């Protein structure tokens, strides 16, 4: 009974960490990462479509992303979608492809991104605390329904807290690593 609650809690915590890692890919570091374009949606014949489903996206060097659409007619739509995504660069088109040139990041930009990383980490911790609350509520409900004793309930809540502490520490580590990566020149 309690093991099922622990497993559900761990699953919820893993989802929070996966979400945090996904959020981190949107932060720009010193070198270009094509994941910064993951949330760019292109108008493809009237329906919003992820950029990577209408074009090949590659990094050509440490500061440039090259986007080659599968249909040349999509260049204008891709450029518009990138501008609308507000990722901090203007697309340059040569008629065949779209290139994104990322200027070197300033110290202020790096510090701002580090703040964003910390805020993302806090959001993930809130998610984990919500998962902990749900798990504790389930343990207390079992005790109230006389399915477990008061001692088992206390042990169960202690285990829920240990799981929470473990995942909170993982988030702290991920945030510290991301901050170090962002602030590294």
Curated annotation (Swiss-Prot):
This protein's record includes keyword Cytoplasm: yes
Taxonomic superkingdom: Bacteria
Keywords: Cytoplasm, Protein biosynthesis
Principal cellular location given in the protein's record: cytoplasm
Localization per record: Cytoplasm
GO CC terms in record: cytosol
Gene Ontology BP, a term: cytoplasmic translational termination
InterPro entries according to UniProt: Ribosome_recyc_fac, Ribosome_recyc_fac_dom, RRF_sf
One Pfam family from the record: RRF
An MF annotation (GO) of this entry: ribosomal large subunit binding
Function recorded in the entry: Responsible for the release of ribosomes from messenger RNA at the termination of protein biosynthesis. May increase the efficiency of translation by recycling ribosomes from one round of translation to another.
PANTHER family: MITOCHONDRIAL RIBOSOME RECYCLING FACTOR PSEUDO 1, RIBOSOME RECYCLING FACTOR
Protein family membership: Belongs to the RRF family.
Protein name per UniProt: Ribosome-recycling factor
Species name: Campylobacter concisus (strain 13826)
Record lineage: Bacteria, Pseudomonadati, Campylobacterota, Epsilonproteobacteria, Campylobacterales
Gene: frr
């Amino acid at each position: 009974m309690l093991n099922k609650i622990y497993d559900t809690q761990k699953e919820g915590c893993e989802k929070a960490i996966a979400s945090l890692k996904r959020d981190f890919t949107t932060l720009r570091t010193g070198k270009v990462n094509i994941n910064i374009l993951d949330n760019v949606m292109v108008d493809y014949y009237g329906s919003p479509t992820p950029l990577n489903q209408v074009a090949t996206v590659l990094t050509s060097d440490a500061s440039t992303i090259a986007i080659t659409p599968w249909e040349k007619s999509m260049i204008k739509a891709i450029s518009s979608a990138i501008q609308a995504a507000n990722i901090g660069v203007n697309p340059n088109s040569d008629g065949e492809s779209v290139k994104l040139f990322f200027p070197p990041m300033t110290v202020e930009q790096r510090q701002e991104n580090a703040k964003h990383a910390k805020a993302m980490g806090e959001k993930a911790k809130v998610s984990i605390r919500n998962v902990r609350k749900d798990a504790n509520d389930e343990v207390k409900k079992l005790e109230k329904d006389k399915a477990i004793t008061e001692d088992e309930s206390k042990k169960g809540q202690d285990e829920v807290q240990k799981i929470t502490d473990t995942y909170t520490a993982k988030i702290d580590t991920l945030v510290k690593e991301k901050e170090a990566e962002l602030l590294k020149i």
